[in-house]
């Protein structure tokens, strides 16, 4: 039997307005080579100037994962040649990163596990190579975008643990609001280092790096395939020939990894301190940066203070947008448990395809009005579902307008309800006698008949209250 050893390197693009060493915009989707200047094009004489906001965001991350923040950190030149790297070196941090020795906790199959974070360092992103119609093009809009590279300890033991770690990391980054962490746009990318060893062995065997995985599903599939490939090679006696230190790409069509190139060692990059950048020396005020409430803290508060079930709280902290939506709801002085039900079950049940909580046709204010109308007895919970579906499709219609249009307003007028109840009791004198002799289940019959006569418009609470008075 084998033990899997996985370490992950995550590159997340920091959401600064400008690049890390120049004033070019970092906006995504611009025309190729428009967000560029002499610095990110590496023209002679152009000098880098460090973006203070990128430093603050790195510190915020360090605090969120209980890491050590180095008061002194150094930028190095990482030398290699590639078309999308104009300088032929990348400015990164090597010996002294800004963040070291952090941790986060994951839960897999009911078990909590601590995963160490070796380091998190600042660096610049490269440009983008585009290969089409027998031509290769280079777009340098992305060159110089600030990255935070987060390196885990090799303490993950399965693809499930790897995905749990990444989801937790992704959530922390989003709640800190230091990156949009959009995997489709490449602002949260993962490289996985995978190796195997016999159970009980502590030696680290040959590791394979799988590059640029940009979805949780593909990360899981890539790791599972690579573990299978290495395990089969070991069992076949071809491990030393088949498993070499290399970089592999994941084929998302066939769900296999393919060799890309040999894996470089650190010495091959010839790191040395960048002579154009002074060491970063942090004042104490930088270390006192306040960070927002993190997912685990928010979850605990929802459970302890609002009495929400753990499973529901998990859904509410599944994204920053989801938790913001919920908190906007409860800020309207509504019953938290009612809010959970209408958000997690009813509204989320309508969101399909490309619709998410971020672009929901029904915002928190509108859903809040609907919940208020349930609480004040204007409509029943059953009718509210029809109202929600209606305003979901007809976004310009307000809740009260929809209630009127659909004719779903409840009747709470005592005299109107009493008149109907009197008719039903007079028409069913025998059943009234049976009820009074001890057949309590007949109460449901009277409620049903009353609601039927009222065509579902009577307030159920009022119906129950009046019936109890009438029947004694």
From Swiss-Prot:
Disulfide bonds: none annotated. One of its GO terms (biological process) is glutaminyl-tRNAGln biosynthesis via transamidation. InterPro entries: Asn/Gln-tRNA_amidoTrfase_suB/E (IPR017959), Asn/Gln-tRNA_Trfase_suB/E_cat (IPR006075), Asn/Gln_amidotransferase (IPR018027), Asn/Gln_tRNA_amidoTrase-B-like (IPR003789), GatB (IPR004413), GatB_C_1 (IPR042114), GatB_Yqey_C_2 (IPR023168), Gln-tRNA_amidoTrfase_suB_CS (IPR017958). Coiled coil: none annotated. It holds the Pfam family GatB_N. Its EC number is 6.3.5.-. Transmembrane segments: none annotated. Keywords: ATP-binding, Ligase, Nucleotide-binding, Protein biosynthesis. GO terms for molecular function: asparaginyl-tRNA synthase (glutamine-hydrolyzing) activity; ATP binding; glutaminyl-tRNA synthase (glutamine-hydrolyzing) activity. It catalyses: L-glutamyl-tRNA(Gln) + L-glutamine + ATP + H2O = L-glutaminyl-tRNA(Gln) + L-glutamate + ADP + phosphate + H(+); L-aspartyl-tRNA(Asn) + L-glutamine + ATP + H2O = L-asparaginyl-tRNA(Asn) + L-glutamate + ADP + phosphate + 2 H(+). NCBIfam families: gatB (TIGR00133), PRK05477.1-2 (NF004012), PRK05477.1-4 (NF004014). Allows the formation of correctly charged Asn-tRNA(Asn) or Gln-tRNA(Gln) through the transamidation of misacylated Asp-tRNA(Asn) or Glu-tRNA(Gln) in organisms which lack either or both of asparaginyl-tRNA or glutaminyl-tRNA synthetases. The reaction takes place in the presence of glutamine and ATP through an activated phospho-Asp-tRNA(Asn) or phospho-Glu-tRNA(Gln). Heterotrimer of A, B and C subunits. This is Aspartyl/glutamyl-tRNA(Asn/Gln) amidotransferase subunit B. It comes from Campylobacter jejuni subsp. jejuni serotype O:23/36 (strain 81-176).
